[in-house]
């Protein structure tokens, strides 16, 4: 499956600009993802783990509100994904509460979905977290209208 890069929320918009050049492969562990800050929020795409290792972080939990958990000693905010749609140009994750996250353009990845990270107090090095790809595959899927 492929994933996209411009990250948008419906209530507040944060932009993560991806380089149009080829993105590092999931197995290339030497190249860290780019760190960006926008609107006092931190967004990070983490280094992928080796294909045969455990997922890097926690699976999203259920619940109506955005949830906090502690990872590597720091607070991180995770989104509650309920379903997703996909076109040739973007991937949309729908969140509880009506918000959605849109990624564009995306890269080939086979075991781990992205890796979104958002911390309101964005002045420090944020906490990493990932959404395992197997979890994404278990969500209701709809082919979006082109």
Which sequence ranges carry the predicted segments?
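Classical Sec-dependent N-terminal signal peptides that target proteins to the secretory pathway
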Residues: 1-20
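A generic structural signal for ordered secondary structure
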Residues: 3, 16-17, 32-34, 75-79, ...
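N-terminal helix-cap/turn-to-beta initiation motif at the start of protein domains
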Residues: 19-36, 61
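Short, hydrophobic/aromatic-rich segments at coil-to-beta transitions
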Residues: 28-33, 63-67, 87-93
């Amino acid at each position: 499956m492929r994933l996209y890069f411009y990250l948008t929320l419906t209530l507040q918009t944060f932009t993560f600009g991806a380089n149009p050049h080829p993105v590092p492969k999931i197995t290339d562990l030497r190249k860290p993802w780019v760190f960006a800050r926008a609107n006092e929020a931190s967004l990070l795409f983490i280094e992928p783990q080796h294909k045969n290792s455990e997922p890097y972080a926690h699976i999203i939990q259920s619940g109506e509100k955005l949830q906090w958990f502690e990872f590597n000693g720091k607070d991180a905010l995770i989104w509650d994904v309920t379903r997703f749609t996909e076109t040739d140009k973007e991937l949309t994750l729908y969140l509880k509460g009506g918000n959605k996250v849109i990624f564009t353009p995306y890269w080939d990845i086979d075991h781990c979905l992205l890796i979104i990270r958002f911390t309101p107090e964005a002045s420090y090095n944020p906490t990493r977290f990932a959404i395992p790809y197997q979890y994404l595959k278990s969500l209701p899927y709809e082919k979006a209208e082109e």
